[in-house]
């Protein structure tokens, strides 16, 4: 199936008071994400991947070892990453964390505060472009990971519960070179914890 750019689940200016400006979403969603969709569709046309789901393409082309596959993987994975990213955020000043998620984070990391600290450290410590993730491993354990470029948890058989884009285009308009501040703001103000909990 062809890649399609999903509509944002909120208005472009809905997150502005929470630290993600209308301008950032216009560039990030309408231009960057759209480019992954458009390029991905061009690259899969006439290949074995045409008609496959994004998830199948990501898993099938990761570490495929062929240069011809790398462009397909990069665009498919970044399309998938961004589609999740928009859903993992939401408007509203007081976003409650569901009890089951809070309990799981405390059991896995000691406290919600420690989870946030470790997640932000993973994102800040990712050299160059990439993503920070909270994942559920195949054994059900919750883990914090970071990946380079467009690599995502699908590549490792993990379930993505939360992901934060740490490519510079995701934060430079609003935070300039202050990636740690962007990550802290993401965790404290932007995350839709109901969505995260629904992925468990």
Curated annotation (Swiss-Prot):
Recorded catalytic activity of this chain's protein: 2 superoxide + 2 H(+) = H2O2 + O2
Coiled coil: none
Organism: Rhodobacter capsulatus
Cofactor(s) the protein needs: Fe cation
Organism taxonomic ancestry: Bacteria, Pseudomonadati, Pseudomonadota, Alphaproteobacteria, Rhodobacterales
Function field: Destroys superoxide anion radicals which are normally produced within the cells and which are toxic to biological systems.
InterPro entries on file: Mn/Fe_SOD, Mn/Fe_SOD_BS, Mn/Fe_SOD_C, Mn/Fe_SOD_N, Mn/Fe_SOD_N_sf, SOD_C_sf
PANTHER family, per the entry: SUPEROXIDE DISMUTASE (PTHR42769), SUPEROXIDE DISMUTASE [FE] 2, CHLOROPLASTIC (PTHR42769:SF3)
EC number: 1.15.1.1
Domain of life where this protein originates: Bacteria
Quaternary structure, from the entry: Homodimer.
Name assigned to this protein: Superoxide dismutase [Fe]
Co-factor remark: Binds 1 Fe cation per subunit.
GO molecular function, one term: metal ion binding
Family: Belongs to the iron/manganese superoxide dismutase family.
Amino-acid positions noted as binding Fe cation in the UniProt annotation, renumbered to this chain: 28, 82, 165, 169
Keywords: Iron, Metal-binding, Oxidoreductase
């Amino acid at each position: 199936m062809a890649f399609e750019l999903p509509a944002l689940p909120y208005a472009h200016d809905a997150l502005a008071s929470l630290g993600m400006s209308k301008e950032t979403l216009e560039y990030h969603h309408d231009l960057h994400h759209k480019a992954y969709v458009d390029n991905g569709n061009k690259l899969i046309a006439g290949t074995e991947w045409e008609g496959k789901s994004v998830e199948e393409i990501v898993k099938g082309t990761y570490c495929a070892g062929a240069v011809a596959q790398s462009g397909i993987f990069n665009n498919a994975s970044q399309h998938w990453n961004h589609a999740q990213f928009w859903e993992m955020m939401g408007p509203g000043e007081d976003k409650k964390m569901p009890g089951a998620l809070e309990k799981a984070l405390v059991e896995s990391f000691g406290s919600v505060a420690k989870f946030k600290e470790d997640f932000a450290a993973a994102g800040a410590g990712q050299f160059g472009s990439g993503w920070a993730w909270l994942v559920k491993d195949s054994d059900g354990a919750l883990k914090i990971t970071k990946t380079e470029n467009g690599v995502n948890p699908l590549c490792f058989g993990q379930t993505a519960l939360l992901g934060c884009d740490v490519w510079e285009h995701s934060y430079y308009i609003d935070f300039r070179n202050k990636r740690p501040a962007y990550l802290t703001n993401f965790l404290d103000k932007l995350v839709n914890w109901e969505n995260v909990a629904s992925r468990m």
